[in-house]
Design a protein with these regions (language model features):
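Generic long, charged, amphipathic alpha-helical segments
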Residues: 387-418
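Charged, amphipathic alpha-helical linkers/stalks
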Residues: 458-518
Length: 535
């Protein structure tokens, strides 16, 4: 058999590995690159129509985001994933397609005056729907035949609802070889979902290394920490605004808030309202509720057996329309507002920041990672004011963060996972980690007696009865090395300008329905700016 490493090698996003075995070609994940692009993903070495099937570890876009493009370009095989992953991909891929269409529309508006050729979105909602029709849901822990000589089993890995490690048995001639793809290995004791299931045997292992060089801080008591924040904020008469990722983190927060409200832990404010103001989060929450209870951890199942919905917060209010969203801030009752996006770069959360950042009685609570350059990161690092919808907004609210809420295993967790094999695999391929992190984790594994390596994008390996042989080294040239430092700096600055333009378009759309006088003034300001810079 032959393996080609196409993405998320010496970087974290864009996961994809192609296998050619037992007369079949298939992919493990087909994700979109996100954030800084250190090593470019390699293109598929064959036409999409020549791919027989795809196996998906979990629903996050960096593992699934190019599936609509695959369908657009002629792939007609099956996409296998756990049943919850199929459900989550149904909403997440459509959401991603809406973003692709929006960005293409923005670029075309921008290029129309200059006579630039129109651009097409990477893929459309129609492509996403076509990809979703190719999904086939499989049960956890059930060994299935994908093709003659190829069998698979999906094992819960505790990263996200539906996440899995994938065991593969590949028989060629008289030899059967077992491969294990870890997927994203989960952190211990996450709410709602099960902890990672360890696998006992494999010949070859392909494992992630996101936190391969460091451990998480000690896990705090999230409920106790959250109670303190709610208590002091509500006592001041303010709101707690939570920028939250729609899938996973929002449901974890609902789990904590249900316990807080049911036990009456916030004194004097027992009936405080909780709002979900994100259409994607609302859909994801519905999927969590409808999922087979067997996917949940023991604590969650125990609640369900008592007739308690673990994420049904008393007083929970779902905001559907834009008007619903706007009305939230007309009510001065102290409340919790869960809204996307988690890094405050887009979505309804920006409206809530506009209405609450300037109020010293309010709190903005961050519960997830904030990337460099995002509004969320800016607020956490400390700033006196920010611009929202063209207005300078003073930052007087309390800014705080619940640390340690990670869905990924840390270094010790990764080592627990790989050391659970009863015999050391013949080789461990380290993937899905930043450049130096992968190298350090390879060193750690080597010190513990494993044979390990970290292939680059484009690397090819053959695996047979005699072992694994590298056929082709991947590309070790970093993107910034190839383009040159000066060009890279220029590209970065221009990308800032492009991002500002996208933000302007969002601001324009958010002002739909405003007073004519205000809209006219806004239009005059934009036209004056364009007249100044049009070349």
């Amino acid at each position: 058999m032959k393996l080609t490493f196409l993405g998320a090698n010496h970087e974290v996003t864009g996961s994809c590995t192609m296998l050619e075995a037992a007369g079949q070609r298939f992919l493990i994940d087909y994700g979109m690159e996100q954030g800084k692009n250190v090593y470019e993903n390699q293109p598929l070495p064959v036409a999409p129509g020549e791919i027989d099937f795809v196996l998906i570890t979990h629903a996050h876009i960096d593992h699934t985001g190019l599936l609509p493009l695959l369908a657009h370009n002629g792939f007609r095989g099956r996409i296998y994933a756990t049943i919850p992953t199929v459900e989550l991909c149904g909403i997440m891929l459509r959401d991603s397609a809406h973003i692709q269409e929006f960005e293409a529309e923005w670029k075309n508006r921008k290029g129309k005056r200059s006579g630039a050729e129109p651009v097409e979105p990477m893929y459309t909602v129609q492509d996403a729907e076509a990809a979703c029709r190719l999904f086939r849901g499989v049960e956890y822990d059930k060994r299935i035949q994908l093709a003659p000589g190829i069998e698979a089993r999906f094992v819960d890995v505790g990263h996200l609802l539906g996440s899995a490690s994938i065991e593969l048995w590949i028989t060629e001639g008289s030899t059967t070889t077992k491969l294990v793809f870890s997927g994203d290995i989960g952190n211990l004791e996450q709410p709602i979902i099960k902890d990672t299931t360890h696998i006992q045997q494999a010949d070859y292992v392909f494992m992630e290394s996101t936190y391969g060089d460091r451990n998480h801080d000690p896990r705090p008591d999230y409920v106790a920490e959250l109670v303190k924040i709610l208590q002091r904020t509500f006592d001041r008469g303010g709101n707690v605004v939570v920028p939250s990722f729609a899938v996973g983190r929002t449901q974890e927060m609902l789990y904590f808030l249900r316990e807080i409200k049911e036990k009456g832990l916030v004194k004097g404010h027992g009936n405080f309202p909780v709002y979900i103001d994100s259409p994607l989060a609302t859909e994801a929450t519905r999927i969590f509720r409808d999922t087979d209870p067997g996917c949940f951890d023991a604590q969650t199942r125990a609640l369900l057996e008592k007739g308690i919905d673990p994420i049904n917060v008393p007083g929970l209010r779902i905001s559907v329309t834009s008007e619903d969203s706007r009305m939230i801030n007309t009510d001065r009752t102290p409340k919790v507002i869960l809204s996307a996006s988690g890094m405050c770069e887009a979505g309804r959360i920006r409206h809530h920041l506009k209405h609450n950042l300037w109020r010293p009685e309010c709190t903005i609570l961050f519960v997830g990672f904030q990337a460099v350059g995002t509004l969320g990161r800016t607020l956490i690092e400390g700033v006196n004011s920010v611009k929202l919808f063209g207005e300078p907004i003073e930052v007087k609210a309390e800014i705080c963060q619940l640390t340690g809420m990670s869905g990924h295993a840390d270094k010790d967790g990764l080592l627990r996972w790989v050391n659970a094999f009863t015999e050391k695999p013949r080789r461990v391929f380290v993937i899905h980690g930043e450049d130096e992190v992968e190298n350090r984790f390879v060193d750690t594994l080597t010190e513990q007696g494993f044979t390990a390596c970290a292939p680059y994008n484009g690397a090819q390996w053959a695996i047979g009865a005699e072992g694994a042989v590298c056929l082709q080294e991947g590309t070790k040239v970093r993107v910034e090395q190839r383009t040159g430092e000066g060009a890279n700096r220029a590209a970065t600055v221009f990308q800032r300008l492009v991002s500002a333009g996208k933000r302007l378009l969002r601001v324009i759309e958010h002002n739909e329905g405003g007073a004519n006088k205000d809209l006219a003034k806004f239009a005059d300001q934009i036209n004056a700016l364009c007249d100044k810079w049009d070349r």
